[in-house]
Amino acid sequence: MITRPPIKQRLVSEQIRREIIEGQFAPGAQLPTRTELERRFAVSTITVQRALDRLAAEGFIHARGRRGTYVAENPPHLSRYGLVFAHHDSEARPWPRFWTALHNEAKRLEQSEPGREVTIFCDADPHGRSAEAQRLMRSVKAHRLAGLVFCFQPNWLSGTPALEESGVPRVAITHDSGLPGVTAIKLDTASLLDRALDVLAEQGRKRVAMVTVGSIYASAADRERFHAGLADRGMSTQPYWYQVLDVNRPQWARECLHLLMNDGQKHRPDGVIIANDNLVEHASAGLIAAGVRVPEDASIVAHGNFPWPTPSVLPVTRLGFDAREVLRVCFDSIDAQRRGEAVEPEAERWVKVKFENELDSADIRAG
């Protein structure tokens, strides 16, 4: 149970923290002595000590014995990024594989980029009903974060410190942010579709099926783009070859692909795009059940989140997004906002699609 510090202690720590955040005490700068702080705030030695202990625990300062107390070289408001997931990963509510890739690579990034620290929050309950959500709100209000990266559209957090606290840069990995002060980090799914179709065309495929989920390529505009891309390449499809599944029930991809590709069908696709990596494993099982030989009977292009692509027992061409690049774009955007660079109210930054063979094979992790 976390208790609130006494009022005077809290006021001292808040004021010193504010002065560090505003740059009155730069990273590495020495703070006034304890005696000077006692006089300035008209408080006791123990009150000053506990206020400084609190700031040290938060990562803002550190003591050097008799040499005094100094601002940390990498204080949290400049170096600690909050990576926010909507909920915990659980059997009842499993994470999409994209979130798992981001989570895994966030901690690795700390090791490869000294001076950057990632704090992970796995509950964004706007009502603060969990300890995790309360920790998020407290960290934001105390400016213990350089900025926030939301792995989802955070509109339900309107009215909470997570979106309303001033001076906190924010980005959201989303198709459309639509929120003032939140930069949208967008994955270039349009080029993913184009490059997938290019691969199938290069392999001589003419009849293409698409299997996707409700969050991507599921709108009427997406379907029109798919048909236009096929027409541009002299390819074709059928209305019932465009299947949209529930991302939370990926196991049904097995039956879907078995139905599409079994030898009882009069016409079968010779190219399949599996547009979400949560479906890949089950879709591959469906192709095997249908007796499809890959690549003799059909070519398969599968979405993946690198460097953690979904395993497949079939030879598939993978393309998708590198979680490391996504995180770097997010953190760089936060840094730009913190430097005061102009950011439009609904600014966007894009992450480009990559083929698996465009990455170093040594970077690929077992999914």
Predicted stretch roles:
Residues 151-192, 278, 304-316:
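Flexible loop/hinge segments that line or gate small-molecule binding clefts
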